[in-house]
Amino acid sequence: MAEQDLLKTLGQLITEQRNPNSMQIDTLSAYEIVQIINNEDKQVPLAIEKVLPQIAQAVEKIVEAFQQGGRLVYIGAGTSGRLGVLDASECPPTFGVSPEMVKGIIAGGERALRHPIEGAEDNKEAGKQDLQAVEFSPKDVLVGIAASGRTPYVLGALAYAKELGAITVSIASNPNSAMSQIADIVIDTVVGAEVLTGSSRMKSGTAQKLVLNMLTTASMILIGKCYQNLMVDVQASNQKLVARAIRIVMQATECSREIAETTLALAENNAKLAIMMILADLDKDGAEQLLSQQQGKISRYTIV
């Protein structure tokens, strides 16, 4: 895009406007500065509340994809890409799923997680190529993330996913963006002008993080990765998580610590399996069979 056209485009974006509440921020005390930032951050959950129906719709499509062997793939550049990678990386330890189930892709690759990669976000073809590199398929769901809603790298990825017939979702902080013209489900978290003009790592990034939390958490809940509000599929891979798994078994079954530890050992540190063993008074094999019959959802057994 020519420089003059880019200047005009940026001038029309809400995220590039000057915030009247922070015009004199460079003359304020530390407390006054953080107070302004905090007050602006309060706008984020209010903006998200307005798009909860679209977020729920995206969750339903993600669940359908998971149930059919598909994946959730995030793609973005800069802060947006980093947040996608972060959310994806938390899913295996939290929900006990394969790292392939939720993937995060950032423009410029692994190095871009820590260092800016010049021109990476401007490469539209690279978005397509990076999806091809992970063998993105029509069974998958693509979530494109960009505060501006116009990042070429993300647009290229969305267009390719759309061409394949996959479900596409856009997350942006500007309404009626180029991304929204492609995506099947449009999530526009319009948080307003940033405290520092154009610094979309702030309110826009916070909104993205909250939405991504919702997408994965709600989807995992719906496919049975929790019981009540307990992370029963947590991977007990360190001392803290082993202790958490013991507490989860105790809380879910109201059993003693001794019973929880013993049953967890028999269940090979699988908290969900240990819970089912205790609730149904079954051995490991019997509990595994029952969980399979209930599609991995403990609540289907306890509610009956």
From Swiss-Prot:
GO biological process: 1,6-anhydro-N-acetyl-beta-muramic acid catabolic process; amino sugar catabolic process; N-acetylmuramic acid catabolic process; peptidoglycan turnover
Keywords assigned: Carbohydrate metabolism, Lyase
Domain SIS: from-to ranges: 62-225
Reaction(s) catalysed (UniProt annotation): N-acetyl-D-muramate 6-phosphate + H2O = N-acetyl-D-glucosamine 6-phosphate + (R)-lactate
CDD domains: SIS_Etherase
The keyword Lyase belongs to this UniProt entry's keyword annotation: yes
Record keyword Transferase present: no
Its EC number(s): 4.2.1.126
InterPro entries according to UniProt: Etherase_MurQ, Glucokinase_regulatory_CS, MURQ/GCKR, SIS_dom, SIS_dom_sf
Active site: 90 (proton donor), 121
GO terms of molecular function: carbohydrate derivative binding; carbon-oxygen lyase activity; ether hydrolase activity
Pathway(s) of this molecule: Amino-sugar metabolism; 1,6-anhydro-N-acetylmuramate degradation; Amino-sugar metabolism; N-acetylmuramate degradation; Cell wall biogenesis; peptidoglycan recycling
Superkingdom, natural source: Bacteria
Further information: A lyase-type mechanism (elimination/hydration) is suggested for the cleavage of the lactyl ether bond of MurNAc 6-phosphate, with the formation of an alpha,beta-unsaturated aldehyde intermediate with (E)-stereochemistry, followed by the syn addition of water to give product.
Function comment: Specifically catalyzes the cleavage of the D-lactyl ether substituent of MurNAc 6-phosphate, producing GlcNAc 6-phosphate and D-lactate. Together with AnmK, is also required for the utilization of anhydro-N-acetylmuramic acid (anhMurNAc) either imported from the medium or derived from its own cell wall murein, and thus plays a role in cell wall recycling.
NCBIfam families documented for this protein: N-acetylmuramic acid 6-phosphate etherase, PRK05441.1, PRK12570.1
Entries under HAMAP family matching the protein: MurQ
Subunit structure: Homodimer.
Homology family: Belongs to the GCKR-like family. MurNAc-6-P etherase subfamily.
Protein name according to UniProt: N-acetylmuramic acid 6-phosphate etherase
Species annotation: Glaesserella parasuis serovar 5 (strain SH0165) (Haemophilus parasuis)
The gene coding this protein: murQ
